[in-house]
Amino acid sequence: MKELSQIRKAVLGALRGAGIAAMEAFPAEQAMAYSGAVAAVGVGAASGKTAGFCHYLGEMRDPETQVIRERYGKELFGQITVELRANRAADCERGCETATEVLLGGLPEGIRTGELTWEAICWEKTTGMFLRRGVLECRALFLTESAVESGEFLDFRLKGVMSE
């Protein structure tokens, strides 16, 4: 799974866990079907850099198998975009309050949050709903390991998220 998709999936899961209907893209044809706030989540501008020397962070021993693995990491800077829509302005505001709590304190440890900004609530003619847009500046940390013997690499995974 690519890094931007992992960030988006983590944010979607956190918002859903807090009771907000959340999806990757807002389905305009279903806009009126939601009784409360619904969030569309995206990952905006992103840039990356290595963590450690050429991504290398050192060796670790697997506590179960005692196999030594090399650990690599990378860091991605980006913007998480959230668009909240609701039939009522009050629902949009409540959704924004809940989303703020989640975005600033309920994401996996691999997503380090920065500044969160929200636009004012406005009326969106195309959907006939109230809309509030937010942007969260963040950096995300990804880790991968390789077995020293085989040199095989696993995919980079967002720190703090269980692998499937």
Summary of predicted features, one role per range:
Residues M1-D62, L158, M162-E164:
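Small/polar-rich, solvent-exposed N-terminal microdomains that initiate assembly or binding
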Residues V11, L15, A22, V41, ...:
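Hydrophobic beta-strand residues in large extracellular and virion-surface proteins
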Residues F26-P27, T65-Q66, T117-C122:
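Short structured motifs
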Residues G44-A46, R85-A89, I121, R139-E145, ...:
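Generic structural motif
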Residues M60, E64-I80, R157-E164:
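C-terminal basic regulatory modules in eukaryotic proteins
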Residues E70-A90, M129-F142:
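Oligomerization/assembly interface segments of phage tail-like spikes and tubes
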Residues C92-E149:
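Acidic-leaning, charged glycine-interspersed low-complexity segments
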Residues T144-E164:
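Protruding loop/beta-arch "assembly-hinge" segments enriched in small, turn-prone residues
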